[in-house]
Amino acid sequence: MKYKDLRDFIQRLEALGELRRVTQPVSPVLEMTELCDRVLRAGGPALLFNAPTGYDFPVLGNLFGTPRRVALGMGVDAGDDAALDSLRDLGRLLSALKEPDPPKSLKDAGKLLSLAKAVWDMAPKSVSSPPCQEIVWEGADVDLNRLPIQTCWPGDAGPLVTWGLTVTRGPNKSRQNLGIYRQQLIGRNKLIMRWLAHRGGALDFREFALQNPGKPYPVAVVLGADPATTLGAVTPVPDSLSEYQFAGLLRGSRTELAKCLTPGVDTLQVPARAEIVLEGFIYPQEGAPAPAPAGAPPRPAGNASAKYEHALEGPYGDHTGYYNEQEWFPVFTVERITMRRDAIYHSTYTGKPPDEPAVLGVALNEVFVPLLQKQFTEITDFYLPPEGCSYRMAIVQMKKSYAGHAKRVMFGVWSFLRQFMYTKFIVVVDEDVNIRDWKEVIWAITTRVDPVRDTVMVDSTPIDYLDFASPVAGLGSKMGLDATNKWPGETNREWGRPIEMDAAVKARVDRLWQEIGL
């Protein structure tokens, strides 16, 4: 089933028993986090808080708290297991778009043409008088404190926008970038835009600042987009395809877009049926910036974007289960807020796994598998355990063909997709190990690994700056473990033979099991 907007999706989830309305007053300060966290850990429904304490806007939480709801958001109506299979089909589609196979026949050529036509037909379309602009706040009416922005953890620096779909465009680019970056509230119309240096929004901003020094950089933030657009922003979409176009493929209909209203920001387009849209700029720094507080990291310097307004972000409780360090990021000044009538504020929290991003990671893991298999045909399965903060550890199952093969796969995974840039640990196992069962993975590590021979250490590599275990912020080491059976050339010893029961005996005991009534 396809959903034209967030409200359509909410209605469907409620009909399936996948959403619960909370009519009791619940505060966005800490209480929503605690309630959503308990419900998510129990595999419970999405929550629509109809009476957030002190606010007039309902709050939607735990929307993608199960793999089934992630699949539903992508248009797949199935149970958890079938949903994950369908997500692999989506990965195959992305793989075909990223690197199409050369056609071997007229039939194959026809399939490629059909796929190209489907992508072309899903080009976004512009609409006038969109629902997302039914209500407009301008001037003194622009006050972010009127929105029920969550404060998630006791040690957080303040309220935090968590599901903001940020729309940017680089200079001379027709394609808009969509990314989800958290944003700290620091004033009635000011947010800190926490985007890491390699993310699309940060790259667009740096390129703009380099080519247009001293000019304000336009940004729009969407709160409450339809599920296909939201999930498209967190999916590894090929660079040649816009997230809006990919959302159209998921939805089965073209994404409707509306131009922003603010002069200068009207070069950007946002989902026409979004709940709330923030329009504004990252402005150049006026005058000399105030010195950094004692003990704070130094202000950014040395590039064109450093000449724009920045502020210290954090600390905040993060997906690692810890509070992160403070860091400087650009300040986004909101000049206009547009919204639908009776707008819904979409929010989440991040914390020690499992949290909502970890569940999204489990679902998107299935999308990654076909992408990896397209590049590395020896990979038979791939798993990002949610306990590893969604991306910091990867377990790879492979069909090994020669000595050193596992190490080749390690470096291939680290370098293939941007999503694996921050993966610290990779464990490679053979086909006989179920990589989704920790008992089997640990058995393979403890019986097939020699720490000196089978450990690969790589120093001075890009690391998530939130990873305080690294000696330098943003730069650290990676480790690979070859837990495969060793081939000649990798060992001089006779390798152990796994114990297996005789097949005929197993069949006999299967029958006996039923007779005994065990």
Curated annotation (Swiss-Prot):
Species lineage: Bacteria, Pseudomonadati, Pseudomonadota, Betaproteobacteria, Burkholderiales
Pfam family of the protein (one): UbiD_N
Entry similarity comment: Belongs to the UbiD family.
Entry annotation: catalytic residues: 318 (proton donor)
Residue sites binding prenylated FMN per the record: 180-182, 194-196, 199-200
Membrane topology qualifier: Peripheral membrane protein
Gene3D superfamilies: Single helix bin (1.20.5.570), UbiD C-terminal domain-like (3.40.1670.10)
Full protein name: 3-octaprenyl-4-hydroxybenzoate carboxy-lyase
GO CC term (a single one): cytosol
Subunit structure: Homohexamer.
Listed cofactors: prenylated FMN; Mn(2+)
InterPro entries for the chain: UbiD, UbiD-like_C, UbiD-like_N, UbiD_bacteria, UbiD_Rift_dom
Residues involved in Mn(2+) binding: 177, 243
Localisation per UniProt entry: Cell membrane
E.C. code: 4.1.1.98
The entry's keywords: Cell membrane, Decarboxylase, Flavoprotein, FMN, Lyase, Manganese, Membrane, Metal-binding, Ubiquinone biosynthesis
Organism: Burkholderia lata (strain ATCC 17760 / DSM 23089 / LMG 22485 / NCIMB 9086 / R18194 / 383)
HAMAP family: UbiD
SUPFAM superfamilies found in the cross-reference section: FMN-binding split barrel, UbiD C-terminal domain-like
Recorded catalytic activity of this chain's protein: a 4-hydroxy-3-(all-trans-polyprenyl)benzoate + H(+) = a 2-(all-trans-polyprenyl)phenol + CO2
